[in-house]
Amino acid sequence: MSPQTETKAGVGFQAGVKDYKLTYYTPEYETKDTDILAAFRVSPQPGVPPEEAGAAVAAESSTGTWTTVWTDGLTSLDRYKGRCYHIEPVAGEDSQWICYVAYPLDLFEEGSVTNMFTSIVGNVFGFKALRALRLEDLRIPPTYSKTFQGPPHGIQVERDKLNKYGRPLLGCTIKPKLGLSAKNYGRACYECLRGGLDFTKDDENVNSQPFMRWRDRFVFCAEAIYKSQAETGEIKGHYLNATAGTCEEMIKRAVFARELGVPIVMHDYLTGGFTANTTLAHYCRDNGLLLHIHRAMHAVIDRQKNHGMHFRVLAKALRMSGGDHIHSGTVVGKLEGEREMTLGFVDLLRDDFIEKDRARGIFFTQDWVSMPGVIPVASGGIHVWHMPALTEIFGDDSVLQFGGGTLGHPWGNAPGAAANRVALEACVQARNEGRDLAREGNEIIRAACKWSPELAAACEVWKAIKFEFEPVDTIDKKV
């Protein structure tokens, strides 16, 4: 060994492997206002103490690796390392802990959800010392959130663009989602919009397939929008899905939508990717387009309770990346969603300031400062009998989207849309008169049926349809 090598090895460096907790578990640490805070649900392998597991998560998602490296001496680990600063057992579970990790802000590129997730949930989820790992929540400090544009427009600007106030907006996903020609697709859009809906929607997997190329669909849907607007005197829209195989193609589709003069486009933000989504959100703000976001693929990531990432984290990431609407579950429909948990992340989407509330799954107080809000979209297995509950649960700043609940009407698409509009107007009027929608909902709908044969027919068709399954992902409750 040369003298040079001996000198390098002998100055403040000891090779080998040491426990993560010696460096990355710091229960005495006081978090800073500028730290990004994360709450992980950690399930260690047998024999791995929670302190070591939490420290491993902090290390592997920040500056650490499996062994000591001499280049640690070339930087300040105390400045850049993640720190596991608190651990608590999960109620009702023998071998799960919530580990809280603080990350210094300098670890992350400004305005990049992609970089934030690459660090926090990149490698660590495959770590062998853990049986399972789930990111439950993030606290995004204003010093970081202000580096993002956020939603292209936000709730109030959208209401002003549409000139629609004091009620939820109504939408419909065109079905069958695949197989229609562009002209028949546009016809279905027109009938739904003419019948009383505010929006119609491309399904998430409608892009540019052989049976219906995107440009043809855009043209026929624009025709449906203009014709229905002329006949109803209301502003209408169709979520034109601009998701594509490349960012360049996606922007080309958004440009064509703008040239047609339509008000809104759509993106599948998880399958399309956060870089593409942020790019499209910036284009939409610069060019006056609203942006509807579909969360296709989310359940692959968020549905299992002990591994993956909770949707509240994906919702926060979307608000930062940019979107004016996002699907959020229904509570009452066919898709997963516990009520209190759903309302928790709905508030995280819409409100400026959200207090910590573990009863709703919110681990940290979140201050969005002036970032615009996102409208939650309730969609999936809902029909007219659900209208009172949806109006009561989601309030005015929401989109209630009935696909089969519009197009499945026995008299056709326009009567299906009319039935939904009548049901909504009846519920909003009853609420404004002080009636209890949760208790009197069925009575309100039955009364409205007397002066709407379309609603009466819809109520008869779906009177026995229910989706009564226990949710998989639930709030932890003390036993």
UniProtKB/Swiss-Prot annotation:
Q: Which residues carry this modification: N6-carboxylysine?
A: 201
Q: What is this protein called?
A: Ribulose bisphosphate carboxylase large chain
- Keyword presence, Zinc: no
Q: Which residues bind substrate?
A: 123, 173, 177, 295, 327, 379
Q: How is it modified after translation?
A: The disulfide bond which can form in the large chain dimeric partners within the hexadecamer appears to be associated with oxidative stress and protein turnover.
State the EC number(s): 4.1.1.39
Sites binding Mg(2+) sit at 201, 203-204
The family line of this record is: Belongs to the RuBisCO large chain family. Type I subfamily.
Source organism's superkingdom?
Eukaryota
Show the PROSITE patterns listed in the entry. RUBISCO_LARGE
